[in-house]
Each structure stands twice: as C-alpha cells, then as structure tokens.
C-alpha cells in the first residue's frame, strides 16, 4: 500500500458506506472510521472493511485518564487497525502509556497519532477554552509533546505541515484533514488546501471525505487525486 489518501467514511447507514467502499480500490486508499460510524456500527463494520482488504484508520480521538486510553488503544490494536489516534491535550503521561501498551505488537502495532488542534478551531475558539495562543503555536507545542512521548506523528492542518516538518523531522508522520480538490466546497473545515499543495508542503497522508464520497463517480475522483499527487 503506497497511497497517501485516506477516505473519510462519514455515513449514517452501513449499506450506504459499503456501497461507496465497493466502488473503490483498496490499493488506491485507506479508510477512516470516526466516532459516529463506530458508535453506530461497531467493530463488525471495521471487520467488513478488513475483509475487503482496506487498511483502517480508527479515528476515535481518545482522551481520558492514561490507563483508560492505553486499554482502548490496545483494543484497537487487537482489532487490527492500521492507525489510531488520541488527543495530545490529554498529556504526556497519557500518550506514553498508550505507546507503551503497543510494544508487544511489534511491527503489527498500529500507527499511533495525536490530534493537536481541530481544523475547525480558530484563535477565538482556543481563547474561549483558556488557551491564549494561535492555532499554530498550540499545534507546535502539542506536536513537540507528542514526539517526546514517542508517538508516530500528528494530525494537523495542511498550512501547518511545513513548519511541523522542519520542527519534528522527516520521520514524524503528518496526517492532514482539510483537503479539498479545486472546485469543491470547504464544508466545516476552516484551514484547507488542495491535495497537490498539501503533498508539496510535506504531508504524509491526506484525509478526504465529501469530495470523494459525494462524487458522482467516486472511483474516478480517487484515481484522479492519486494521479495529481504522483
């Protein structure tokens, strides 16, 4: 699997999600399952995606006491997902315990990624929760904390990629939502970029939802994006 594209499955019904999944090639993307779908459909849905040979990013953004998060991460590893995430704002100890619990899995452990600042958040949103810093300042602070904890990388907006790449090095994975091909709606993302621009900036993986899932021909859009990013 070499594709950098992660397709976000944001559906209410299993049948609708699988109808989309059955139109696309697992060699051209991975799939992201978030809170809504996982809460509704559970682990059996993830298993169905695995049966179709898709790698799965389990996007549940764990944020709790260290022991609880570590156990949840272990459960995700047992499920066989490719990537799982947690909130860096849960703190260093929470992240360290989550990383440590994956050690017995060796090369079969999922990538463990931290969420820094949600891409919908702006300066005012941070100020309202007591953080007197710009989104970029907070992202950089949490990315350094994530790296200190030994995690594999962070989720960040495309505009933050170049700074994070320089600050954290080439081996630190950068997963970027807020990806919109030219001519598509920005939706509820506030900090967005085209796929080509994001890859040039240094993104490792691009999370793309509606531009693919709501397209008349999802397979063709996916193929086109893969071609555009090389």
From Swiss-Prot:
Gene3D superfamilies: Aldolase class I (3.20.20.70). It catalyses: orotidine 5'-phosphate + H(+) = UMP + CO2. Substrate binds at residues 10, 32, 59-68, 119, 180, 189, 209-210. The active site is at residue 61. One of its GO terms (molecular function) is orotidine-5'-phosphate decarboxylase activity. Its EC number is 4.1.1.23. SUPFAM superfamilies: Ribulose-phoshate binding barrel. GO terms for cellular component: cytosol. Keywords: Decarboxylase, Lyase, Pyrimidine biosynthesis. It is an enzyme of class 4 (lyase). Pathway: Pyrimidine metabolism; UMP biosynthesis via de novo pathway; UMP from orotate: step 2/2. Pfam families: OMPdecase. One of its GO terms (biological process) is 'de novo' pyrimidine nucleobase biosynthetic process. It comes from the Bacteria. InterPro entries: Aldolase_TIM, OMPdecase, OMPdecase_AS, OMPdecase_bac, OMPdeCOase_dom, RibuloseP-bd_barrel. SMART domains: OMPdecase. Belongs to the OMP decarboxylase family. Type 1 subfamily. Homodimer. Catalyzes the decarboxylation of orotidine 5'-monophosphate (OMP) to uridine 5'-monophosphate (UMP). This is Orotidine 5'-phosphate decarboxylase. It comes from Haemophilus influenzae (strain PittEE).
């Amino acid at each position: 699997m070499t594709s950098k594209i992660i397709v976000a499955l944001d559906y209410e019904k299993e049948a609708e999600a699988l109808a989309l999944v059955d139109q696309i090639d697992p060699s051209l993307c991975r799939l992201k399952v978030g809170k809504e779908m996982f809460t509704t459909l559970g682990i059996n849905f993830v298993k169905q995606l695995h049966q179709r040979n898709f790698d799965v990013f389990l996007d549940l953004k764990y944020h709790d006491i260290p022991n609880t998060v570590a156990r949840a991460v272990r459960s995700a590893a047992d499920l066989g997902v490719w990537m799982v995430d947690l909130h860096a704002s849960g703190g260093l100890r929470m992240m360290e315990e989550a990383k440590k619990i994956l050690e017995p899995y060796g090369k079969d452990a999922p990538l463990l990624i931290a969420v820094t600042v949600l891409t919908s958040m702006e300066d005012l949103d941070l100020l309202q929760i007591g953080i007197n810093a710009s989104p970029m300042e907070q992202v950089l602070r949490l990315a350094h904390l994530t790296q200190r904890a030994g995690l594999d990388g962070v989720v960040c907006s495309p505009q933050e990629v170049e700074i994070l790449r320089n600050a954290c090095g080439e081996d630190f994975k950068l997963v970027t939502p807020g990806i919109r091909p030219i001519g598509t709606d920005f939706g509820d993302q506030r900090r967005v970029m085209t796929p080509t621009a994001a890859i040039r900036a240094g993104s490792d993986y691009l999370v793309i939802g509606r531009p693919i899932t709501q397209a008349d021909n999802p397979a063709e859009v996916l193929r086109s994006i893969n071609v555009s990013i090389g």
